[in-house]
Amino acid sequence: MIPVVALVGRPNVGKSTLFNRLTRTRDALVADFPGLTRDRKYGRAFLSGYEFIVVDTGGIDGTEEGIETKMAEQSLAAIEEADVVLFMTDARAGLTAADLSIAQHLRSREKTTFVVANKVDGIDADSACAEFWSLGLGEVYQMAASQGRGVTNMIEYALTPYAEAMGIVRQGEDEVTEEREYTEEEAEAEQKRLQDLPIKLAIIGKPNVGKSTLTNRILGEERVVVFDEPGTTRDSIYIPMEREGREYVIIDTAGVRRRSKVHQVIEKFSVIKTLKAVEDANVVLLIIDAREGIAEQDLGLLGFALNAGRALVIAVNKWDGIDQGIKDRVKSELDRRLGFIDFARIHFISALHGTGVGHLFESIEEAYDSATRRVSTSMLTRIMQMSQDDHQPPLVNGRRVKLKYAHAGGYNPPIVVIHGNQVSKLPDSYKRYMMNYFRRSLKVVGTPIQLRFQEGDNPFENKTEKLTMSQERRRKRAQSHIKDRKTK
């Protein structure tokens, strides 16, 4: 699973500055979907090849009554759930009583902790940081978060233990060729292999929207404790099941509540668990309460699922028992506020009575198949050429932008890499046109599709392809399926 990094410290030591710097690479993705809000406390970051969830825990006001009462419950929860804690201090202000109390709490939790002395720009950093060694948490790492100094080195060092285990691609490796080219026959065989794997389905949403009720309806038994009170699911529950010959792993996540409404520490843990479940899933099923409409929390969860590139299905629950006027208003609100995700199927269901639940799986399978479908290089290049024939790229400085070659750059979500001349100058309107053209041509439903543009000629032309070990294993699996099919 993707690691979680918690930023801990007293107020005004630079936690939010570091959070914004780490997560800003994802802002552009969110901006691609107008009307979408994001949760400023939880973010998905990508730095130096490492991908992780970063949590800004908020500050601690004082120490008079002890760390347990002064640290926000959300901060306690984040520390418990985090894989790595960055304990941030202010090198200019020096060591404070609050720093000592926080350090005492962190030592008692035995978490992997790194002391960060922030704001070292313009001062004698070594002298200013010396006193922080007395915290008893090991080495003190110098940083100037506002300028980005020391940030990359800190993250690389903190997350090194997760690199090999998680198969993280380090920056500098060629991400474009990470997914090898498929022939038509190999793509078909690989798709068949993927259809035999269980679909990991994360059911997410605010508390009390009916996630556990829906899980029980799907399973046909009381597998998840359900009470008519928000937050009764304490942890993400992984439940294997089979339906009409297809295997699934249902991930029933604890509800995400507004921070102002969360009073029990155990319930706050569920926020991070939900975000980690999204990362672990193939398909995300977002449940919305028909009686409450679309809340900001719904949009925040939606944004995280989109940023993670997960296939998506939306279910509007509790559709039974409301009058037609309310139904019309809900549908109008969905059209107005969720028009930017027109690729996702929307279902109106009653988890309690089972109305419409069966049709969910048609969309879930459709979304999974679209997100993981292997497409040959020749097919992608043909579609690219057809899009040019139907609508030529614009002129740039009197020269026509020329698209030469397309190939797959990744899956779940599908990524198409397009090579050509002056592609960096293509207007957003033409990029959207091409994205929609690929979506229609490939019949991609239920998943975002990403286009990446690279300058230059076909990088594979007149070049012998050297496969990585993982690519070689995938090639052998595809060839094995082809042989098995031919012998039958």
UniProtKB/Swiss-Prot annotation:
Q: Where is the composition biased (Basic residues)?
A: 473-488
Q: What are the boundaries of the signal sequence?
A: none
One GO biological process term: ribosome biogenesis
Name the keywords, alphabetized: GTP-binding, Nucleotide-binding, Repeat, Ribosome biogenesis
Matching Pfam families, A to Z?
KH_dom-like (PF14714), MMR_HSR1 (PF01926)
Q: Where along this sequence does the record place binding of GTP 1?
A: 9-16, 56-60, 118-121
Q: Could you give a GO molecular-function term held by this entry?
A: GTP binding
- Quick one: where's region Disordered? 460-488
| Residue span(s) of domain KH-like | 373-457
The entry marks the following residues as binding GTP 2, namely 205-212, 252-256, 317-320
Q: Which PROSITE patterns does the record associate with it?
A: G_ENGA (PS51712)
Keyword flag Transport: no
Q: Where is the EngA-type G domain?
A: 3-166, 199-372
Report the InterPro entries cross-referenced here: G_ENGA, GTP-bd, GTPase_Der, KH_dom-like, KH_dom-like_a/b, P-loop_NTPase, Small_GTP-bd
Quaternary structure? Associates with the 50S ribosomal subunit.
**UniProt cross-references to NCBIfam families, sorted A to Z:** GTPase_EngA (TIGR03594), small_GTP (TIGR00231)
Q: Which family does it belong to?
A: Belongs to the TRAFAC class TrmE-Era-EngA-EngB-Septin-like GTPase superfamily. EngA (Der) GTPase family.
Q: Which HAMAP family match?
A: GTPase_Der
Q: What does this protein do?
A: GTPase that plays an essential role in the late steps of ribosome biogenesis.
Q: What is the name of the protein in this document?
A: GTPase Der
Q: Which organism is it from?
A: Shewanella baltica (strain OS155 / ATCC BAA-1091)
